[in-house]
C-alpha cells in the first residue's frame, strides 16, 4: 500500500536486523526481517509500475569469510557462519534471482551495495563498539570488549551514503550497466583491529578505560576487508576521510549532542567537508 501511494521512481532498501550477536539469540526474526523483508519489498516493487531502479543495501559480512588478509571483491562467493551474515547472503541471492526472473525483463534495474563497519554520530545501537564506548564513557564505566584483534573496514557514515546515492542515480539513468553488486568500503589502511580503535579513542578521552571480556564468545569473523576498486573506477566514488578523521568527527558529534547543541548545525558542516561529492 505504501508503495502504491508513494509511486516512487527509485527504491532504496536499508531496513534490517543488523546485529550479529542478536541473530544468535533471535535467528527466526533475523531471517524474517533480512530475507523475507527483501522478498516482500521486491514483490511490492513488481506491483508498482512507477519503479525504475532499486538498490538493496546488505553488508560486507555477506561474503563467505575465509579469514584471509585480502579484501573481498564483488564476485566472491556468498556465505555466512552466523544467522545475520547468512541472512544477508540470502538477501543478495534473492536480489539476483528477482533481477534475473522478474525485474530485468520488466525494465526495473536492481543493484546491491555492501559497505563496511559504518560509524558516526547518532548511532545508539547496542553491541556496537563505538556506541558502547561512548555509553561507558558517559557513565564512567569500564568498557568491556570481546574481540580485540578482530579487523573491520571502518568508515564514516556519509561515505557509503554518497556511494548509494551515486549508484541509485546511475541505475535510474544508465540502468543495465550498473545493475549488479557493488562494494563501498574504506581504503585498506582504515581496516584496523578493534584494539586499535579503542586505544585511539582512549587517547582522545583520557577518562576512558577498557578490558577484554573473559567469557566465551559466539563466533564472529576475525578478518574482514572490502575491495572497492570497481566503485572507484566506474562510479568515480572514493573514500574522502581516513579513520582518524571519522573517529574524531564521531566524538565531536557526541560531545555536541551532550551539550544540547542543535544537531543539524553540527551535522551539515560534516557534509560540506565531503563536498563536492555530496
Regions found by a protein language model. Give the residues of each.
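Alpha-helical substrate-binding/gating segment
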Residues: 104, 131-143, 154-182, 199
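Catalytic helix-loop patch of NAD(P)-dependent Rossmann-fold dehydrogenases
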Residues: 25-43, 47, 52-53, 57, ...
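C-terminal "lid/loop" region of Rossmann-like NAD(P)-dependent oxidoreductases
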Residues: 179-183, 192-198, 203-223, 265-272
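NAD(P)H-binding glycine-rich loop region in Rossmannoid oxidoreductase-like domains
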Residues: 1-32
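Conserved C-terminal active-site "lid" loop/helix of NAD(P)H-dependent oxidoreductases
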Residues: 157, 164, 180-181, 216-238, ...
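Glycine-rich "substrate-gating" loop/helix at the edge of Rossmann-like oxidoreductase active sites
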Residues: 81-84, 115-127, 147-159, 186-190
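Non-catalytic, hydrophobic alpha-helical segments
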Residues: 160, 164, 184, 194-197, ...
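Amphipathic terminal alpha-helices
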Residues: 243-278
Amino acid at each position: 500500500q505504501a508503495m502504491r501511494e508513494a509511486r516512487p521512481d527509485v527504491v532504496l532498501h536499508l531496513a534490517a536486523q543488523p546485529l550479529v550477536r542478536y541473530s544468535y539469540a533471535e535467528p527466526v526474526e533475523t531471517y524474517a526481517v533480512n530475507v523475507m523483508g527483501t522478498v516482500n519489498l521486491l514483490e511490492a516493487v513488481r506491483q508498482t509500475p512507477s519503479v525504475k531502479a532499486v538498490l538493496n543495501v546488505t553488508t560486507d559480512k555477506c561474503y563467505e569469510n575465509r579469514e584471509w588478509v585480502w579484501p573481498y571483491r564483488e564476485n566472491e562467493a556468498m556465505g555466512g557462519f552466523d544467522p545475520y551474515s547468512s541472512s544477508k547472503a540470502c538477501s543478495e541471492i534473492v536480489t539476483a534471482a528477482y533481477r534475473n526472473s522478474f525485474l530485468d525483463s520488466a525494465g526495473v534495474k536492481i543493484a546491491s551495495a555492501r559497505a563496511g563497519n559504518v560509524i558516526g554520530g547518532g548511532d545508539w545501537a547496542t553491541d556496537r563498539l563505538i556506541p558502547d564506548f561512548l555509553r561507558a564513557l558517559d557513565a564512567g564505566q569500564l568498557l568491556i570488549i570481546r574481540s580485540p584483534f578482530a579487523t573491520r573496514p571502518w568508515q564514516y557514515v556519509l561515505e557509503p551514503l554518497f556511494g548509494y546515492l551515486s549508484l541509485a542515480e546511475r541505475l535510474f539513468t544508465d540502468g543495465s550497466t550498473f545493475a549488479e553488486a557493488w562494494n563501498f568500503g574504506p581504503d585498506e589502511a582504515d581496516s584496523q583491529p578493534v584494539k586499535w580503535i579503542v586505544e585511539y579513542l582512549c587517547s582522545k578521552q583520557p577518562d576512558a578505560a577498557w578490558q577484554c571480556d573473559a567469557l566465551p564468545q559466539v563466533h564472529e569473523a576475525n578478518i574482514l576487508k572490502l575491495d572497492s576498486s570497481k566503485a572507484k573506477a566506474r562510479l568515480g566514488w572514493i573514500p574522502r576521510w581516513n579513520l582518524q578523521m571519522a573517529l574524531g568527527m564521531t566524538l565531536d558529534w557526541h560531545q555536541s549532542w551532550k551539550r544540547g547543541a542543535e544537531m543539524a548545525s553540527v551535522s551539515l558542516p560534516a557534509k560540506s567537508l565531503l563536498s563536492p561529492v555530496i
